[in-house]
Amino acid sequence: MTSDWDEIKRLASDFQKAQLTTSLQRLSERNCVEVVSLLIEKGLLEVIYTTDGKEYLTQVHLKQEVRDEMFVRGGRVNLVDLSKALTVDFEKVQVVAEQIVVEDRSVKFILGQLIEQFYMERVASEINEKLAQVGEINVADLTVQYDLPADFILNNIILRHLNKTIMGKQDSSNANIFFTQSYVARSKAKVRGALAAITKPTPVSAILAQCGIPDRLFNLLVNEVATLGSVTSRTPGALYIPHIYTKTQVEWVQNFYRQNGYLEHDSVAGLGVTDVKNFIVNQLPNEKIVHLKKCSVGEKLIEQVASSLEECISTSTYLDVSTVLPSIMSDEDVDQLLTIVLTAPMQKQVLIFNSTILTTKFVEDMIKPCYDIAVENAKKSVDSGTYQQYMAEKMMKHQDVIPDKESAENKADKRDERRKKAAGGKAGGGAQGRETKTKSTKKHARGHRGNVSDSDEDFGPAEKSAGGKKGAKEASIELITVKDISKVLHGGLEEEGLEDLAKQLAQHYYPQFSRLALAKAHELYEISLHQNNQNRRQTHANLQDKLNNLFNDIRLYEKGIKLLPADVQPQLVKYLLKSLGTDFCNEIFFYVAAECNLNSNGTTLTVEQRNKIAADCGQEYRGALQALNKATASSAAVDDFLVVAENSLQACSMILKKIDKKKDRNLILCHKHGLLEQLANCSDPALVLHLAVLILFTISTQSMLHASGRHVSAILSFLQPALAPEQAQTLTTYHDLVLKLLSVENASDDSKADADEVKQQLEKLTPTVKDIAGNYKKAGLTSAE
């Protein structure tokens, strides 16, 4: 019983123990969380939560897991990847990583990565294998391959394992490049072989492409192996020039120069020479070389040209330099060479046209006839007035340059001066007054022109152009042409086969002969001007008298017109101004045109021609001429015409004589005698009637009358009271017969018999009409006075 009870107690104790043990192992998750939280609160436990919050890690355990991951991943792990794999926050992992780096110096922390020492040893082994295969390796390439900084690879991997794991040599010029000695030996052999096979200048780039080595290594090795040539530079465009090629260049240049005395630049450049001129000088140090554009020549060739030129000058002939010089020389080369050879005295004795040299003596013998042509043409230009027109255009062109204000003031002063002199002339006598005015006019029209002709512009290039207007080209004249000179030269040059130079030579001599012709024309012009000036005073006086006579005639005719009925006067005034007024106007305009050297061909002028002269003449004439032309064309009142006519005379420096009634009576008497003389010699019935009526009017009124045939009827009606009845009847009958004759003559041929009958009647009455006019005496009418 007791043993059973003990057994029961033992079993109960075991059971209780079992119960207690089982309860400890089966704590619920909630209980565990509470227990851990309690430990953390009391500071007895430090844990790290996973990102999902389901697990706890201690710092030591996390450090161990990081190391395990580094080992699993081959000694290199990224903290970002590590954070994801361990499901731990990145900052916690970074803190642990920094602790590992501090505790273990063999571990490196680079760019967010942990790298073990054995990983770096493995990379060093791989680099060594690649270096052995390729022969050369660049840290930059390794940086791309391993995704590590260049400094880290260079300092922590390559240099630390150089000549241990990595068997190679660092480049002295570039610390990032490593190569093996065998690679250098192979490359040197390639370079040596390539350079030995080259016989002409070859680009270094072509050599590198053929050998398959980098230019850096080539530049390193070329000085060691280039015993048969040289490299021009270390730039990408460098050339390798073999010594054999340089030797061939030098021999070719020396031999060619020795045989020909010159070297063509293109030929030397074709040998591969870049600086041709310096190369020639270096290869021919003892020669006096002259560099031209396309070639370089030696002293021997220059002396040959000089001797040929001296012979040409001494014999007064010509020389074609192309026969002495090489054919490859351009015109510019020839010019440069001749500039060197020709001395100052020689240059005065020759003319150069491309490659042909003519002596001046040779040309002057052929060109002598041109002097006669120039003189002859100059004389013709003066005789025809062409040179005078040129001088006028030139003078007007220069006058246009003067400012308007200054020009107006000068002209006003001159006009005042002329008026003062005109007043002085009237006081001292007509002849003296005219002389004073003539001198003033001469000074205005000729003096400035002489100054213009003395300028150098007279001898400029000749080309016809219109002058005298603003904006026009400079006035010029061509007295001798290039064609004239060329024609003279062509004959002499053709004999020598140089006719192609005729035009060029003519163009060369053209300015000289143009100046000669202009100078001769000016000389002849001055002579003719002097001769013309001697007659100018008398011509001016004659024109003044003529215009005074016309002026007085118009004035006296106006008095006669005023005696007629008012309805007849306008027609007679119009006829008077259209005839005598136009004559007066034309004389004034012809005079001004001559003074201003304007074109005024013909004996009469139309209204348009007079307008053009008024527009082109000097300012001192323009206003008066325009008013005169307007008054003449409008045929208004005679008084208005006489006013503008007097103004035009003053503008032309002419004096209007005072009215003298005694002279007026003499003029009327002379006019009557003139009409009687015409009547005595006249046989035409219409003209007989016209003259008879005018004579009767002059005698009966003691006034002159200027009328046309259409006004005969009106005048005859006016004279009826002054005639005897039989005289009036005779004149009326004669007048009717004249009208009948004119109408019959304009009719058909059937009226021919009537015309003959009328003519017979007129022939019978004509002596009677002439007798009436010739013997008529004033009876009962007061005179015009």
From Swiss-Prot:
Superkingdom classification of source: Eukaryota
Amino acid composition bias (Basic residues), ranges on this chain: 439-449
Pfam families linked: E3_UFM1_ligase (PF09743), UFL1 (PF23659), UFL1_C (PF25041)
GO cellular component, one term: endoplasmic reticulum membrane
Entry's Gene Ontology molecular function annotations: UFM1 ligase activity
Entry keywords, A to Z: Transferase, Ubl conjugation pathway
GO biological process, one term: regulation of proteasomal ubiquitin-dependent protein catabolic process
Stretches with biased composition (Basic and acidic residues): 396-416
Residue ranges, annotated region (Disordered): 396-473
Disulfide bonds, paired cysteine numbers: none
UniProt enzyme class: transferase
Record-linked InterPro entries: Ufl1, Ufl1-like_C, Ufl1_dom, Ufl1_N
Family: Belongs to the UFL1 family.
Function as written in the Swiss-Prot or TrEMBL entry: E3 UFM1-protein ligase that mediates ufmylation of target proteins.
Protein name from the UniProt record: E3 UFM1-protein ligase 1 homolog
